[in-house]
Amino acid sequence: MAAEGKNVLIMAGGTGGHVFPALACAREFQKRGYSVHWLGTPRGIENELVPQAGLPLHLIQVSGLRGKGKLSLLKAPFTLVKAVLQARRIIRQLKPVCVLGFGGYVTGPGGVAARLCGVPLVIHEQNARAGTANRLLVPLSARVCEAFPNTFEASDKRRTTGNPVRPELFMDAQRVPLGERRARLLVLGGSLGAEPLNKLLPKALSEVPAALRPEVFHQAGKQHAPITAERYHEVGVEAQVEPFINDMAQAYGWADLVVCRAGALTVSELAAAGLPSMLVPLPHAIDDHQTHNAQYLAREGAAFLMPQATTGAAQLAERLNEVLMQPEKLNVMAGTARRLAKPAATSTVVDICLEVAHG
């Protein structure tokens, strides 16, 4: 354990979209001599990733309320009070100089407990539309960090920081000019794979003239990779289909164009890598936050926003033909994406935490 006054508590859980930016900040705190502890819940991905990172993980019992039955709703106040008390006990034991929350069910009770203990609370919102817990915690927070501008209402607390992403994803601007080789298309469906994209891309690419057709690397998810490869084979399109991508920096460095969903971290990584994209937001995401994320790049001309409901194979093929016939357009989009990146996001978030911790 670090010396007195050198503990920091990070709260993040549930999905990688919350946990990965938090891990980036955890490493930055450690570089500056702080001991990082983590507050999570028993069911989230943090139970795998946080111990792998060598960080102590403290658990509280809390879950979401959306879509739950009447009995769960009746129990909710008691469950939340219990979670707050559990978090307060952990905070009193650790005596952190600040508490930094990234979202997930753990953040609500943990944020309330931080306020009860008199520990400065900083929250970070990864999406362009703030989650419920973060919205409710704004009045209790010393600072509120947002990845995208104007996610929160204007106030003295608000800071636009960007999303912390791994430094290796910030790419050198130099790529082999497209005129000297075939274009390279990277398709990302997330760790589980996005089946609508898995069905859409083979059909769309079959409608792109063979002379114009790009090299294709398609990450389809473990369940869907075999059938996706078969779909490409059936329409006569060459593609490398994989369940996962272990080295995202290498994949981004290879690509000229990306087709993917619009999760907050993905959007930030595309900017970091300086990659143009065609974004198909998950249509049923909470508060439609993926559409708002995609608009950040699309408004500036770094991406095309393609709603799933109105994007079929013909529409996607038309858009692909448009940019593949105009490689200079892809170059302009890439430069715009790179200008929207926030390479200092991780250090900025940590600076803000230490500013409120130590005045």
From Swiss-Prot:
Its EC number is 2.4.1.227. One of its GO terms (biological process) is regulation of cell shape. Pathway: Cell wall biogenesis; peptidoglycan biosynthesis. PANTHER family: GLYCOSYLTRANSFERASE, UDP-N-ACETYLGLUCOSAMINE--N-ACETYLMURAMYL-(PENTAPEPTIDE) PYROPHOSPHORYL-UNDECAPRENOL N-ACETYLGLUCOSAMINE TRANSFERASE 1. It catalyses: di-trans,octa-cis-undecaprenyl diphospho-N-acetyl-alpha-D-muramoyl-L-alanyl-D-glutamyl-meso-2,6-diaminopimeloyl-D-alanyl-D-alanine + UDP-N-acetyl-alpha-D-glucosamine = di-trans,octa-cis-undecaprenyl diphospho-[N-acetyl-alpha-D-glucosaminyl-(1->4)]-N-acetyl-alpha-D-muramoyl-L-alanyl-D-glutamyl-meso-2,6-diaminopimeloyl-D-alanyl-D-alanine + UDP + H(+). One of its GO terms (cellular component) is plasma membrane. The keyword Glycosyltransferase applies. Cell wall formation. Catalyzes the transfer of a GlcNAc subunit on undecaprenyl-pyrophosphoryl-MurNAc-pentapeptide (lipid intermediate I) to form undecaprenyl-pyrophosphoryl-MurNAc-(pentapeptide)GlcNAc (lipid intermediate II). This is UDP-N-acetylglucosamine--N-acetylmuramyl-(pentapeptide) pyrophosphoryl-undecaprenol N-acetylglucosamine transferase. GO terms for molecular function: UDP-N-acetyl-D-glucosamine:N-acetylmuramoyl-L-alanyl-D-glutamyl-meso-2,6-diaminopimelyl-D-alanyl-D-alanine-diphosphoundecaprenol 4-beta-N-acetylglucosaminlytransferase activity; undecaprenyldiphospho-muramoylpentapeptide beta-N-acetylglucosaminyltransferase activity. Its main location: membrane. It holds the Pfam family Glyco_transf_28. Belongs to the glycosyltransferase 28 family. MurG subfamily. UDP-N-acetyl-alpha-D-glucosamine binds at residues 15-17, 127, 166, 191, 245, 264-269, 290. It is found in: Cell inner membrane. CDD domains: GT28_MurG.
